[in-house]
């Protein structure tokens, strides 16, 4: 299968995947561009940071020579109006299926993927009908390619627990680090990741209250002894100053819950201190990971 250069990897040509999407347009002499060409150009443009149809069309014109390496482009680059009209007509579920099929073939895993971040989001203003339930999505992001490589709809945030194993099963996890927020801090999830050859970084919160309390007390004692942390990063932007400090410790044989967590090697605490307009806020978050502590 031919490939094109993606954000940080060699990705498969999206055209064959998009050719499976039904074309909603009538067959007329005015239909100058194939649906798969339009969708493929738009995909490349969005991956390159374009965020409106005029920018997508401009990207196509600027990169036409490169695009012709894997797209016919029989009639050149569509106008921004054509992009907007086509995307307003296509079946969103068919597009979603084709996109995720393409992403699943994008060699996401192994040498290409270093980190996969799973994150649940409730879509704003998505309450449906009289039940008033919002649409909740579980996303899997490739941190290297900046791609949303998988997505699952879940009825409630609590159902992320059942969707996480399903998403993880889509990928080759060998050598990959999986980071998940607190709802994914489950022994079965840790086992699935390590048995597949991956590593995990799992956030701790109230769903593992005893473990969270033990880890937080231990790591805060370490922070009191070494207040500067083992690493520090400072970001300044428009009057906001954010300082992040991190503490890690792999001397955890004292932790009674350690045998229950497959592959657990290291405890982590991250402190985020934000200063804005004279106001200071500070948050500390704890994690468990199967990675060893850096020397």
Curated annotation (Swiss-Prot):
InterPro entries: ISAs1_transpos (IPR047647), Transposase_11 (IPR002559), Transposase_11-like (IPR051698), YbfD_N (IPR032806). Pfam families: DDE_Tnp_1, DDE_Tnp_1_assoc. One of its GO terms (molecular function) is DNA binding. One of its GO terms (biological process) is DNA transposition. PANTHER family: H REPEAT-ASSOCIATED PREDICTED TRANSPOSASE, PROTEIN YBFL-RELATED. This is Uncharacterized protein in dhlA 3'region. It comes from Xanthobacter autotrophicus.
